Swiss-Prot record:
It comes from Saccharomyces cerevisiae (strain ATCC 204508 / S288c) (Baker's yeast). Pathway: Amino-acid biosynthesis; S-adenosyl-L-methionine biosynthesis; S-adenosyl-L-methionine from L-methionine: step 1/1. The lineage of its organism: Eukaryota, Fungi, Dikarya, Ascomycota, Saccharomycotina. This is S-adenosylmethionine synthase 2. Its cofactor is Mg(2+); K(+). The gene is SAM2. InterPro entries: ADOMET_SYNTHASE_CS (IPR022631), S-AdoMet_synt_C (IPR022630), S-AdoMet_synt_central (IPR022629), S-AdoMet_synt_N (IPR022628), S-AdoMet_synthetase (IPR002133), S-AdoMet_synthetase_sfam (IPR022636). Its EC number is 2.5.1.6. CDD domains: S-AdoMet_synt.
Amino acid sequence: MSKSKTFLFTSESVGEGHPDKICDQVSDAILDACLEQDPFSKVACETAAKTGMIMVFGEITTKARLDYQQIVRDTIKKIGYDDSAKGFDYKTCNVLVAIEQQSPDIAQGLHYEKSLEDLGAGDQGIMFGYATDETPEGLPLTILLAHKLNMAMADARRDGSLPWLRPDTKTQVTVEYEDDNGRWVPKRIDTVVISAQHADEISTADLRTQLQKDIVEKVIPKDMLDENTKYFIQPSGRFVIGGPQGDAGLTGRKIIVDAYGGASSVGGGAFSGKDYSKVDRSAAYAARWVAKSLVAAGLCKRVQVQFSYAIGIAEPLSLHVDTYGTATKSDDEIIEIIKKNFDLRPGVLVKELDLARPIYLPTASYGHFTNQEYSWEKPKKLEF
């Protein structure tokens, strides 16, 4: 028997206090505040952050009455930046707001006067969805573990078990996989990388010991670790200055962290700060729903789907499927199954996936496809 091929694959994730992630969360907090009062809000909200300053800018058309200052400060407080000693303070930071109405040229192209089903796509673009059978969540193990390491650090910071932790954290996980005719089978964890912002008083040696014991060993399945697993915990040594003080932040700069950790192609459009009329978000969620449904139905072990849209046109212009040789049917047959089971017009997706609700802030941390409670994570029963 020939030895099956193994390979290494890596994904990274970042914590809630990473400057780009702060911006994603602020943008989605504003979106949620709009949708809470007006489900038909049209929102394209960007955020930028640097030392002592948050700026929100973009186009919002809504009947909602918003206190932007309060929304921004509440979001930063929840993340955990409540003291300038941590590099950022929700109480004293400067909040700048430059929000205008949606362009009437864009609005007229979407045909709001028609029924919701015929709502045109809010822009052109390509979206990808991906699913794999290697984890119950249908996500690559690399990105799932990278997210879980950051989640565990946030929990340990909030419950006081690691009180020296600060909100800005980064993780990276390398898994050794076996390629089983296109299916990815995780064999072992090759490398774990963690960098965590910390209080000044803890030594690097103590920090490394505690992160290894209280984070790595609790999150990573023991049977995936071996004597050859490599650990790079706080490889830079000191990391006291973090968050927006250490680095500027922008909405939409962590789109690989938000999605599939590099295991799938990327459409290029970010998710956060956009309402459901923006297919960058709604159609990417739908593509995940389709991919996950195909794997759950046993039609394939791993799949990527691509959709494309044009502004003002409701129906997608194209569908593409790649099952990596893991499918029980041809790709053409699978495309027909998708067409038969899914209506991919944005105005239909908003109803089927219930997207006109204030549900988006939690998606802005630890990936948009990690929380299994979301509608797009629940596979549809397919007829074929």
